[in-house]
């Protein structure tokens, strides 16, 4: 069963300031928790477009949202094609967009998907299982320098060089096929004192490989700009991130687009075209309450940022 506990449910959807006859986009349908709550606030004239590139997630979401048939358009696509896919169904402007980034619990909990360092499974990590690049290719075929680069950049792993060197030596003997093999190699490469602190030793490397396989940061950066573009003035975008790399992209995009430009002193008024495109709804990110954390520990690293479109 595709069981998934939705993070920051009310905060994310209520933050969109939902209009009952509005058009909304859920870029990360997943377990459909946010979508279901959003749809419950729409009248029959309201509409939701729901994106997911995971076939299993879409199938379960269609069952879960069966009561709203006719109001939901399901799109199997990476959200980097947000604007194009909306154009294809005749939608150019929307009232709100939401992103809930990171891997959904069912993907983590299904061993054969290869996302989890707790289960031995084939190295995969593709969000879209019809996509080309898999974790197995990254681990076995990418040169040492490229592995160091992604481990450091996407995993913020201080033992990147040691781990990449161990991977290189191991794959010379035979291909690294499973998550279990990779975990053992990582553990061997990290000094014992460091292994005993700071969570699971493979956590950062698995995150780095997953980001590389799915091109997550670039995809999010592109999609966030498209989301802001398709918003009507007064429309809002809610973004939940789970690690500092994504949060940095969201924070800097929102900051850049909500800050007035440097203008010559003495201008009586700011010309309209120089006014910021966005207005921040919350200056500091919203995090999960103690009550939510008791029920869902995965919400611990979640940060929610919301912005409103001020002008075209």
Curated annotation (Swiss-Prot):
It comes from the Bacteria. GO terms for molecular function: rRNA (cytosine-N4-)-methyltransferase activity. Residues 285-312 are annotated as: Disordered. The keyword S-adenosyl-L-methionine applies. GO terms for cellular component: cytoplasm. GO terms for biological process: rRNA base methylation. Its EC number is 2.1.1.199. The keyword Methyltransferase applies. Pfam families: Methyltransf_5 (PF01795). Keywords: Cytoplasm, Methyltransferase, rRNA processing, S-adenosyl-L-methionine, Transferase. It is found in: Cytoplasm. It catalyses: cytidine(1402) in 16S rRNA + S-adenosyl-L-methionine = N(4)-methylcytidine(1402) in 16S rRNA + S-adenosyl-L-homocysteine + H(+). S-adenosyl-L-methionine binds at residues 32-34, 52, 79, 100, 107. Gene3D superfamilies: Putative methyltransferase TM0872, insert domain, Vaccinia Virus protein VP39. Its main location: cytoplasm. Belongs to the methyltransferase superfamily. RsmH family. Specifically methylates the N4 position of cytidine in position 1402 (C1402) of 16S rRNA. HAMAP family: 16SrRNA_methyltr_H. This is Ribosomal RNA small subunit methyltransferase H. It comes from Bacillus licheniformis (strain ATCC 14580 / DSM 13 / JCM 2505 / CCUG 7422 / NBRC 12200 / NCIMB 9375 / NCTC 10341 / NRRL NRS-1264 / Gibson 46).
